[in-house]
Amino acid sequence: MVDNYAKKDSFSKNVQREFDRNGERYSFLKWGQSAFNNFRVVPPGTGICHQVNLEYLSKVVWSSEANGQLFAYPDTLVGTDSHTTMVNGLSVLGWGVGGIEAEAAMLGQPISMLIPEVIGFEINGKLTEGTTASDLVLTIVQMLRKKGVVGKFVEFFGSGLKNLSLADRATIANMAPEYGATCGFFPTDDETIKYLKFSGRDENTIALVKKYSKEQGLWSNQNDQIEFTDTISLDLNSVVPSISGPKRPQDKVLLTNAAKDFDKAFKENTKRKVPLEAKVNNKEFKIKDGDIVIGAITSCTNTSNPSVMIGAGLVAKKAVEKGLKVKPWVKTSLAPGSQVV
């Protein structure tokens, strides 16, 4: 929660407030970590849980011993947040579930589900200069919303996968709730291995992932003729800079049409005829419809993608150079996906 903002010590103060609010919870969880062998706690302030899964917790392939035999099996994940699906960018099948289901899974109970339809999403080409993973994912959201993928799995394949970084794949997988699918899965390939090395996984784990995936037919192979329930395709060269809104992520708006679309939405939604009086730092301000009151770079989708974060930093740098200033009533916040990002 952002209580303090626009000051050099805002981060440390907000972290301290979190400890003050949740000290009892943190103490209980710390006890749990020492009491149970299969229970780990990631310290507060480390990052957004989905990014921590990518960087630290997920193994892609696990191994364990039972009855004197060593078994290897695919990594899976269920979480209580809808954007748990982000881990599918790392070839780990996972999605969000309800609290009771998650608790049952923690206690060793299975989660039941119907075998889903699988929609193949073919990706070809390469993103043009000036377009980002955010532009791509908004395009995919719009396409899959029109297609109708509620309750279905989406698996991405095609020659264009080699042109998508793991961070870009994670961005796409993260938005599965927005395009309506249970998950958006990326198969294991060289980019997966590259990320595991980059994030400091040990050599034995990486070797196991590569060998197991290839032996079990889980390794991405463009020559394989996979049978999907249905397919859809996208040429990355056709993706252009976009935003979405004003309310739904599938309402994609080309950046070139942003001003016109804002004017249209403003006229349709404006209801306040008299400005609202607000007091900030003991000063009175009048705020009217259309004024920005929150400037936040905090979503688990964008703040976990280094290239998008760099883009935000460059825009901020240019804004400072041009002498632009934030209005006193605007609450600003930045929450990177992790300390690594």
Report each predicted region and the residues it spans.
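Fe-S-dependent hydro-lyases/dehydratases of central metabolism
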Residues: M1-V341
